[in-house]
From Swiss-Prot:
Domain DHHC, first and last residues per copy: 160-210
Principal location class: membrane
Post-translational modification: Autopalmitoylated.
The keyword Membrane belongs to this UniProt entry's keyword annotation: yes
Top EC class for this record: transferase
Any one biological process term the GO annotation gives: positive regulation of response to salt stress
PROSITE patterns named among the record's database cross-references: DHHC
Protein name: Protein S-acyltransferase DHHC9
Gene label: DHHC9
Function recorded in the entry: Palmitoyltransferase involved in the positive regulation of salt and oxidative stress tolerance. Palmitoyltoylates the salt tolerance receptor-like kinase STRK1.
Organism phylogeny: Eukaryota, Viridiplantae, Streptophyta, Embryophyta, Tracheophyta
Length: 382
């Protein structure tokens, strides 16, 4: 009877940690325990570790930890790539060893044995394409084409030279300090791919996210059908109601069915929960990057716009204060976060994305990059 509550507690703690890690820096959580958990996970735990190592082992050990940090965070390395391969390989191996014996089953066709292999193979192919394809490196040879392809908007992108590459930096490009190169239509540096995500490989990255979301969802659903088939074939509900006199209702059957499943099929339950959580996280990333593609925006540009809007708001507030105007504070952070109303000063701050050409053309630009079109080649010859 205590097992379901244990699962609820485990799920609640997991959800709190995930939400704190991903969303703890949102303004809505400022000053709350969610922000404090986020700070501990992203900075605090590491700083405490450094202090502990320094106190226990001295400067040499501390410098060693800092060297490992530099290798892992400031230079290209395959650590997360290896971790990804290990996660996929170990998870699929466990599923084959523990769950393929139930395929075919009451609700699951034997075809899924082979579909799973194809699904994992396609995921691995997308991983390789994203990891090892050129993200759109800007060089002295092609910089003129990129300068023509993306105009400067004069707000978040202004004409300037890359201080490292010593070439003009096109609009939407950024110099990646990890890869040490300028990348056109820079989105972000992805440690999982050990590669930048830019103009030429955003399509592979988005396809990778969507496909892995579908794989995890598919795996969780199939495992659920396996468990449902086992309940049906073993007549668990019938035995509980007829032989043990359990009330034939959800509230009466659930604790006993859950106990039986955890006792007999705990591996399948853990795998299904794991895949469902990963699918939920990937679904969020898919939605976010789909939104970026539809609006022809990148992660880097999103941060730039946030910084610009915050700067403009600060300027407006200073002007209002200088003019003796008093702005009423919102009643709460939650209302401020979800409210659609804006103050007079806020309405003057407009995000003017000149690269947004409509959803269809935006998606075409992602999946058929400008640098792979004939017009781009003609600019080179000109």
């Amino acid at each position: 009877m205590d097992v379901p509550w244990l699962l609820v507690a485990h799920g609640s703690v997991t959800a709190l940690v995930v939400v704190s890690f991903l969303c703890g820096q949102w303004p809505i959580f400022e000053g709350t325990f969610v922000q404090r958990i986020n700070h501990f996970l992203t900075f605090g735990a590491y700083h405490h570790l450094l202090r502990l190592v320094h106190a226990a082992c001295g400067n040499g050990a501390r410098d060693l930890v800092l060297g490992v940090e530099s290798y892992c965070c400031d230079r290209p390395n395959p650590i997360l790539q290896i971790f990804y391969v290990a996660i996929i390989g170990v998870t699929y191996f466990i599923i084959v060893q523990t769950s393929f014996q139930y395929i075919p089953g009451y609700y699951v066709s034997g075809l899924h044995r082979y579909l799973s292999i194809v699904a994992v193979a396609i995921g691995a192919l997308l991983f390789v394409l994203t990891s090892f394809s050129d993200p759109g490196t800007v060089t002295a040879e092609n910089v003129s084409q990129y300068l023509s392809a993306y105009p400067y908007d004069g707000i978040i992108f202004e004409e300037k030279e890359c201080s490292t590459c010593k070439i003009a930096r096109p609009a939407r490009a950024k110099h990646c300090r990890i890869c040490d190169k300028c990348v056109a239509r820079f989105d972000h540096h992805c440690g999982w791919m050990n590669n930048c995500i830019g103009e030429k490989n955003t399509r592979y990255f988005v396809a990778f996210l969507v496909w892995h979301f579908l794989i995890c969802l598919y795996g969780a659903v199939i495992l659920g059908f396996i468990l449902a088939g086992e309940l049906k074939e073993r007549k668990v509900v019938y035995i509980l109601t007829v032989y043990y006199g359990i009330d034939n209702s959800f509230s009466g059957l659930f604790p006993h069915v859950a106990q039986w499943l955890l006792a007999v099929h705990n591996t399948q339950i853990l795998l299904a929960v794991f895949l469902a959580i990963i699918a939920l996280l990937l679904g969020g990333f898919c939605a976010y990057h789909t939104h970026l593609c539809l609006t022809n925006t990148t992660t880097n540009e999103t941060f730039k716009w946030q910084d610009y809007i915050m700067w403009r708001k600060k300027v407006n507030e200073e002007k209002a204060a200088a003019n003796g105007e008093v702005r009423k504070s919102p009643p709460s952070k939650w209302k401020a976060f979800f409210s659609r109303s804006h103050t007079e000063a806020d309405e003057t701050i407009v995000k003017n994305n000149i690269y947004d050409r409509g959803m269809i053309r935006n998606m075409c630009e992602v999946f058929v990059p400008l640098s792979e079109r004939q017009s781009f080649s003609r600019k080179k010859s000109d």
